[in-house]
């Protein structure tokens, strides 16, 4: 059966005058209280939306989420916090629930408050119950860019449906000066709040913590899942697998749509002491200028990439350095092949395609640590992303 939309969810999306003339506000709500799991930015400069949403998920139950695209409302002091709280209060009135059961997320330039007169007028004109579940419209509003392809994925797990919408760094409004990552999943599967939170944290660690776009965390990074249980129980192992695959698909989508140009770069690190070490190495390599030089250089040199991998291994006391090998497209490129006359494997990848780099750290003994990071090769478009005001 084709996945459509999970039962018991309603959606509103529209233009609230936040920025531009396109849809820039979305509300996703469950007809009944839903279990919720969420992860947020690790930045100490978290936006008010993150602070309020952390409070909302503390009891493991939520009714909905509101997303404002085009304004991060971060670095705006007490008044910015009050604005975000008012938005949450207005949405709670529409959904007919306690305001602490509403998550809020924002994305866009930092240092500006919401245009509250316009946002307030828009929300006061919305009447509950909300209409049908137009998740494609919600995805477009979350993205907040006219004419862009919404990032949305659907899947099935037994009788339950899962749906996810997302935006990544550089896929948002304000001329791509936005570094936030937002992702929201809804399902009608029945999963307890504690179990759902555990599952989602593992999924987020594998998917969103494997999203390589620089070391700096955004002020508003938010990923959440709501499960309202209307489809009944599901096999939890299968559910985690389906949710994990859905999240990884979204990560790859937002990387491709990031606006930085070039190829999707997937770095798979194996042979590490543990998953933490593998993830640390993978993220460092994806962000390294040496990787981009190797991908695009006329005479690719993978030794600097190996140096980055080795330098972030952090062997520690009692840990022995391994023998690092690097393969691109299945061909070993480090240590350097003897036949340098042969074209490097990476030249087989067209621009806009996908480059897969496999780094084995070669830690002696049993080394089960492995992690995969997705990023892009950051061509000329990327400096424009960092030149804006949003983070």
UniProtKB/Swiss-Prot annotation:
Establish whether keyword Oxidoreductase is in the entry: no
Which is a Pfam family this sequence falls into?
ArgJ
Top EC category: transferase
Name of the molecule in the record: Arginine biosynthesis bifunctional protein ArgJ 2
Q: Per UniProt, which keywords does this protein have?
A: Acyltransferase, Amino-acid biosynthesis, Arginine biosynthesis, Autocatalytic cleavage, Cytoplasm, Multifunctional enzyme, Transferase
Gene3D superfamilies, alphabetized? ArgJ beta chain, C-terminal domain (3.10.20.340), L-amino peptidase D-ALA esterase/amidase (3.60.70.12)
Spell out the catalytic residues. 180
Q: Which residues bind substrate?
A: 167, 180
Q: Does the keyword S-adenosyl-L-methionine apply?
A: no
Highest taxon listed in the record's lineage: Bacteria
- The organism is Streptomyces clavuligerus
GO CC terms in record: cytoplasm
């Amino acid at each position: 059966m084709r996945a459509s939309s999970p039962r018991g969810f309603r959606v509103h999306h529209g233009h609230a005058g936040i920025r531009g003339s396109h849809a820039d506000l979305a509300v996703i709500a469950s007809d009944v209280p839903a279990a919720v799991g969420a992860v947020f930015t690790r930045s100490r400069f978290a936006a008010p939306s993150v602070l309020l949403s952390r409070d909302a998920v503390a009891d493991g139950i939520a009714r909905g989420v509101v997303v404002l695209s085009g304004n991060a409302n971060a670095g705006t002091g007490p008044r910015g916090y009050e604005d975000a709280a008012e938005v949450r209060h207005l949405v709670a009135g529409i959904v007919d629930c306690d305001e602490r059961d509403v998550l809020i997320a924002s994305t866009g330039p930092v240092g500006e408050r919401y245009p509250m007169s316009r946002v307030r007028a828009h929300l006061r004109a919305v009447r509950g119950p909300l209409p049908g579940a137009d998740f494609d419209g919600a995805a477009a509003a979350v993205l907040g860019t006219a004419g862009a392809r919404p990032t949305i994925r659907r899947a099935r797990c037994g009788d339950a449906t899962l749906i996810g919408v997302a935006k990544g760094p550089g896929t948002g409004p304000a001329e791509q000066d936005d570094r936030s990552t937002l992702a929201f999943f809804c399902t009608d599967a029945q999963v307890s709040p504690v179990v759902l939170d555990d599952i989602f944290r593992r999924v987020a660690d594998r998917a969103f913590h494997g999203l390589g776009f620089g070391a700096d965390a955004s002020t508003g990074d938010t990923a959440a899942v709501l499960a309202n249980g209307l489809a009944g129980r599901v096999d939890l192992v299968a559910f985690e697998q389906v949710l994990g695959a859905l999240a990884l698909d979204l990560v790859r989508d937002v990387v491709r749509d990031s606006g930085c140009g070039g190829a999707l770069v997937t770095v798979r690190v194996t042979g590490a002491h543990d998953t933490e070490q593998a993830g640390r190495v993978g993220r460092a390599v994806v962000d390294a200028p040496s990787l981009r030089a190797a991908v695009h250089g006329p005479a690719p040199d993978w030794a600097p990439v190996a140096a980055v991998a080795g330098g972030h291994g952090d062997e520690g006391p009692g840990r022995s350095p391994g023998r690092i090998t690097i393969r691109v497209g299945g061909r070993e490129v480090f240590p350097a092949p003897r036949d340098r006359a042969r074209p490097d494997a990476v030249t087989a990848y067209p621009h806009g395609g996908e480059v897969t780099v496999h780094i084995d750290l070669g830690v002696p003994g049993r080394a089960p640590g492995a992690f995969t990071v997705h990023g892009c090769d950051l061509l000329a478009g990327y400096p424009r992303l960092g030149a804006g005001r949003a983070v």
